[in-house]
């Protein structure tokens, strides 16, 4: 949708204060939304790509040129409380969806060419602790995100996965997925 309407800016209502700022009003410790905004800032570039798919209304998908390197970054948001999804990215970012219980192997495409699967993609899966979307603790790839002993933001390390394998997205979670060197014409 952002691509269709030429949206160029993401704006957050409050950094601190209001009903729910990115930082806690008293401690200035990041609230869970801070980490999704930080990953967006680090991974999603200015070039917005169009994604068309038919599937569940509980799954949202957004694609951008990657921010600091060649490739494409995708954000997947699963709004379902009970259903996980498997997403396969194929030629020119056509996305096929299937429920997790119906995993099937498909020919994988990497940009505009068939890919042999030797390269890896980066996955950043964010969810609430114990699957609770109201949790004050955000998990990155299953690990709690907490400030370091020095009060610094923790390292946000991805899981590396075979580029041609399906992306699994759990209920009530989001995933940033970076496909390095993906050959999207709009990102050249």
Regions found by a protein language model. Name each.
Residues 1-188:
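Substrate-binding and catalytic surfaces of secreted/luminal carbohydrate-active proteins
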